[in-house]
Amino acid sequence: MKTIAITLPDFFPNEAEAINRLFAEGSIDLLHLRKPDSTIDECRQLLDNIRNEYYKRIVVNDHFALCAEYNLHGVHLNRRNPTPPPCHQGSVSCSCHSLEEVVERKPKMDYVFLSPIFDSISKQGYHSAFDEATLKKASAEGIIDQKVVALGGVTHERMAQLQEYGFGGGAMLGDLWR
């Protein structure tokens, strides 16, 4: 099962060191660099302080030009950036908020996030949208599989439960950075 880290939306002191440590400790497989209000130069400054050996494990949610510039793992589509750049060679992922959306978007993606699976740690009042029976049924029907990554309230302690539901991994934000 993959463990994916999502950065906090704002930069913080020694962030690159924290990211390097997560990779070095084997705590994460991929990192989604998600800084929606950042400039491309601010993201470059962060990337310049991350060890280049980890670049192939970083996905950008904004400033897609950084993917080719730093030879990163891929891009994550969103409302701000709904399509990959021309001639993009890396992975392409997106976020889904319903099982219907997973069915529609998963075939065109390398992987998708499905959220919120549990009550969010980082977003107050953002509650789980799926009960256990729904997740087990979706897994049995092949909707949830190795290409679907759980997001929302994911912790290291919940990874075994996500594996039981058939997810290919879990994405963490709040649990990693608090």
Where are these regions (language model features)?
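Alpha-helix-loop-beta-strand connector modules within alpha/beta enzyme cores
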Residues: R44-V60, C87-L99, H127-A150
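Glycine-rich beta-to-alpha transition loops that act as phosphate-gripper elements at the mouths
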Residues: P9, I58-F64, C94-V103, I117, ...
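Glycine/Thr-rich beta-alpha phosphate-binding loop at enzyme active sites
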Residues: Y70, N78-R79, G90-A140
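Active-site mouth loops of central-metabolism enzymes
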Residues: M1-E17, S93-S95, A150
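Alpha/beta enzyme core
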Residues: E17-D29, R80, V102-L114, Q161
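N-terminal active-site wall of soluble small-molecule enzyme domains
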Residues: F23-A24, I28-H88
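Structural preference for beta-strand elements that scaffold enzyme active sites
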Residues: K2-I4, I28-H32, R57-V59, H73-H76, ...
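Glycine-rich phosphate-binding active-site loops on the catalytic face of alpha/beta enzymes
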Residues: A5, V75-P85, Y111-Y126, L151-R178
